From Swiss-Prot:
Residues 9-19 have a biased composition (Low complexity). It comes from the Eukaryota. This is Bowman-Birk type proteinase inhibitor PVI-4. Residues 1-21 are annotated as: Disordered. It comes from Phaseolus vulgaris (Kidney bean). The keyword Disulfide bond applies. The lineage of its organism: Eukaryota, Viridiplantae, Streptophyta, Embryophyta, Tracheophyta. Keywords: Disulfide bond, Protease inhibitor, Serine protease inhibitor. One of its GO terms (cellular component) is extracellular region. The record marks F57, S58 as: Reactive bond for chymotrypsin. The keyword Disulfide bond applies. Disulfide bonds join C22-C76, C23-C38, C26-C72, C28-C36, C46-C53, C50-C65, C55-C63. The record marks K30, S31 as: Reactive bond for trypsin. GO terms for molecular function: serine-type endopeptidase inhibitor activity.
Length: 85
């Protein structure tokens, strides 16, 4: 066990491009205001705006953001490539 922990504090600006808030799989309720939640899995950390990030203990860790917002972030797909469904 090494003390290797990923804190999603904004300590580095290097990862800002990859960790900018975006979401490919976002679902919203039909209520007003809507309650939207992103179900994207990210490796090792959640995006920079995420307050509730849960990660698995696998390597690499798979992380999901549990935040509920009244909007969806822009899709991330442009950074991943065309065939990502």
């Amino acid at each position: 066990k090494s003390g290797h922990r990923h804190e999603s504090x904004b300590s580095t600006b290097x990862a800002s491009x990859s960790s900018k808030p975006c979401c490919b799989h976002c679902a919203c309720t039909k209520s007003i205001p809507p309650q939207c939640r992103c179900s994207b899995l990210r490796l090792n950390s959640c995006h920079s705006e995420c307050k509730g990030c849960i990660c698995t203990f696998s390597i690499p860790a798979q992380c999901i953001c549990t935040d509920t917002n009244n909007f969806c972030y822009e899709p991330c797909k442009s950074s991943h490539g065309p065939b990502n469904n």
